[in-house]
Swiss-Prot record:
Signal peptide: 1-29
PROSITE patterns according to UniProt: SCORP_SHORT_TOXIN
Main subcellular location of this protein, as a coarse class: secreted
Gene Ontology terms, MF aspect: potassium channel regulator activity; toxin activity
Coiled coil regions in record: none
Keyword Endoplasmic reticulum: no
Note in the entry: Negative results: does not block the potassium channel rKv1.1/KCNA1, even at 50 uM.
A GO cellular component annotation in the UniProt record: extracellular region
Keywords: Disulfide bond, Ion channel impairing toxin, Potassium channel impairing toxin, Secreted, Signal, Toxin, Voltage-gated potassium channel impairing toxin
Protein name in UniProt: Mesomartoxin
Function: Recombinant toxin that reversibly blocks the voltage-gated potassium channels Shaker (IC(50)=0.054 nM), rKv1.2/KCNA2 (IC(50)=15.6 nM), and rKv1.3/KCNA3 (IC(50)=12.5 uM).
Cited SUPFAM superfamilies: Scorpion toxin-like
Residue numbers marked as site, Aromatic residue of the functional dyad: 57
C-alpha cells in the first residue's frame, strides 16, 4: 500500500516538472510585448512578430 502511494507521488512530481518546463519554453518563445520598439531600441529599422518570434529588420 505504501509503495503504491510513493509511486503515485513520484509520478505526480515528474509530471509537474515536465509541465513547468513546457510552460517556461512557451513563454520564452513568445514575442516581446512591443516587438517594433524592442527592435528599434536595438538599432533596427523595424520589427515584426512572426510565428511567436520577434524578427528585427536592419
Amino acid at each position: 500500500m505504501m509503495s503504491r502511494l510513493s509511486v503515485f507521488i513520484l509520478i505526480a512530481l515528474v509530471l509537474s516538472v515536465i509541465i513547468d518546463v513546457l510552460n517556461n519554453s512557451k513563454v520564452e518563445g513568445a514575442c516581446v510585448e512591443n516587438c517594433r520598439k524592442y527592435c528599434q531600441d536595438k538599432g533596427a529599422r523595424n520589427g515584426k512578430c512572426i510565428n511567436s518570434n520577434c524578427h528585427c529588420y536592419y
